[in-house]
Amino acid sequence: YFFANLLSATLLTITILFYVIIYTIWLKQKTSQNIVIGGAAGAFPPIIGWTIATGSITLEPILLFLIIFFWTPSHFWALSLYKKEDYKNAKIPMLPVTAGIKTTKINIFIYSLILFVIALTPFFFGYSSLVYFVFASVIGYYYVYLCYKLFIEKSIELEKKLAKRIFFYSILYLFLIFTTILLDNI
């Protein structure tokens, strides 16, 4: 608080408490929606950073929050598909363990579609250029394509390979989206 502002300090405190108490202590062990709800804590850093720099909350950091928020489920559920037994043995109720592989694949695909649309919104609000829009469309299309391939895949062996591929691509995807937003606004 002494080095930023009260708004940033408050948001950071809420984020930490939410992550530690709501997500880690309470939800992680109780519900397969732990990733969706806990994803909010992981998505708050752009808003906190923005408030440190500006002292206010505007639409720009909210869009960044939404990108991370809608990225989180497909990223972690892909991981939980190819590490299902580990989660099961640890008694962590990830979606593949509680609802099955088919439901998880449907959810991964749905979240990838939502993410695709959300990632394009900075362009529609005038926060990024056509270069960002085209690049985000291409890498987002590939992400949706991978998630669709997983959705229709019947082979357990190939499902695990695709899930692992989605997990690692999702990391690259998020890095590229945020790097492109940054470079597009220099």
Residue ranges, per PLM feature:
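Intramembrane alpha-helical segments
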Residues: 1-53
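Helix-coil boundary and interhelical linker segments in multi-pass alpha-helical membrane proteins
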Residues: 1-10, 45-68, 120-132, 181-186
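Hydrophobic alpha-helical transmembrane segments
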Residues: 9-13, 36, 61-65, 105, ...
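Hydrophobic residues within alpha-helical transmembrane segments
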Residues: 14, 18, 40, 66, ...
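Transmembrane alpha-helical segments that form the membrane-embedded catalytic/substrate-channel core
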Residues: 17-24, 66-83, 116, 139-150
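Small-residue-rich segments of transmembrane alpha-helices in multi-pass membrane proteins
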Residues: 36-53, 102, 164-178
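Solvent-exposed interhelical
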Residues: 70-120, 126
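Interfacial loop-to-transmembrane junctions
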Residues: 145-176
